[in-house]
């Protein structure tokens, strides 16, 4: 199933599930008699709630069906937590080499020496991540808003995982049963700011990642049963219709199962948490030193998940 949040005729955020061969949406709010009010409620409701949605979708009343075409889709849900991982070694290699080549002259030599050693061996020993901000979540029809410090504004195409089952100390072999589904994620980044935030005196990414609409997810939340092999999904980025890069989740240095297992070490994971798997190689502008201009339309696609297009606007 594919879960969406859309605006009803009164402008209210409304949960729905895609039906009729991806041509229509079942309004879950009205079809459930007001019992289902958000997609997060479905995620937190577990198997019983999914069964209820399946029953509603199997016998929908015509009055609860709306055409998908023309609907304004919001972010499918607002996650209760956001962890953003980096598990693509090639992305790091290409990014650091680009910074070494193009960034501040006084750092070129030093950065290049670092770049040829990136990633360090610790990168392969365990997955690394930072905490994101869920208040900056935006959806597939929202704008990318350039922050005041966004001279080098960039996109990052990522596969995101939504947790559907509570768990702690989850073994990799059991990780899949804790997944509710998957999303396309654009981890919008202000690179100039990030250059100042990833140095030795920094606690990690901050304002370079945290600004309005910087975490764009969509177009829908696809349940895990519709994604038989999330570790082998092809993906691409287009800017103004031009293909900027193509990649695959098969290039991860740590699997989704390993990421979930590591995250749950000494800590309980809860339904509704979002785990982003990191920027795919060739699918962010910094690697080729091509950044976004106002008016650009950025389209992110992951086969089997979906695609979304967002326009860059000045802040």
Predicted feature locations:
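Charged, cofactor-coupling segments
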Residues: 1, 5-31, 216-219, 250, ...
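Active-site microenvironments in enzyme catalytic cores
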Residues: 4-6, 37-239, 254
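Residue-level "contact hotspot" at macromolecular interaction interfaces
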Residues: 81, 152, 268, 291-292
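Short, surface-exposed secondary-structure boundary micro-motifs
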Residues: 87, 93, 280, 303-304
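Acidic, glycine-rich active-site loops and adjacent beta-strand->loop/helix elements
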Residues: 134, 188-189, 279-282, 304
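Short strand-turn-strand beta-turns centered on an Asx-Gly dipeptide
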Residues: 239-241, 303
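A conserved acidic, glycine/proline-rich C-terminal tail/linker
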Residues: 255-291
């Amino acid at each position: 199933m594919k879960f969406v949040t859309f605006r009803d005729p009164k402008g209210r955020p409304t949960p729905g599930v895609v039906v009729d061969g991806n041509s229509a949406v079942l309004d879950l709010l009205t079809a459930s008699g007001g019992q289902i009010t958000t997609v997060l409620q479905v995620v937190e409701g577990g198997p019983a709630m999914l069964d209820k949605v399946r029953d509603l979708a199997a016998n929908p009343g015509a009055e609860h069906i709306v055409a998908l075409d023309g609907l304004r889709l919001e972010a499918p849900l607002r996650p209760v937590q956001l962890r953003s991982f980096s598990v693509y070694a090639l992305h790091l290699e290409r990014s650091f080499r680009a910074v070494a080549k193009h960034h501040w002259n006084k750092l070129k030599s030093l950065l290049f020496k670092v770049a040829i050693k990136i990633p360090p061996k610790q990168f392969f020993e365990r997955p690394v991540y930072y905490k994101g901000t869920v208040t900056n979540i935006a959806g597939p029809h929202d704008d990318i808003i350039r922050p005041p410090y966004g001279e080098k504004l960039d996109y990052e195409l990522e596969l995101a995982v939504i947790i559907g089952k509570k768990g702690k100390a989850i073994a990799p072999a059991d990780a899949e049963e804790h997944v509710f589904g998957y999303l396309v994620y654009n981890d919008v980044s202000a690179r100039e700011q990030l250059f100042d935030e990833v140095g030795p005196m920094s606690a990690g990414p901050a304002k370079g990642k945290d600004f309005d609409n910087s975490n764009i997810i969509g177009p829908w939340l696809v349940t895990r049963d519709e994604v038989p092999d999330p570790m082998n999904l092809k993906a691409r980025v287009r800017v103004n219709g031009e293909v900027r890069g193509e990649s695959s989740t098969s290039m991860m240095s740590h699997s989704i199962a390993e990421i979930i297992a590591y995250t749950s070490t000494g800590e309980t994971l809860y339904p509704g948490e979002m785990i982003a798997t990191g920027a795919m190689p060739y699918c962010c502008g910094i690697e080729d030193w091509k950044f976004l201009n106002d008016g650009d339309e950025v389209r992110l696609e992951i086969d089997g998940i979906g695609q979304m297009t967002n326009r860059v606007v000045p802040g």
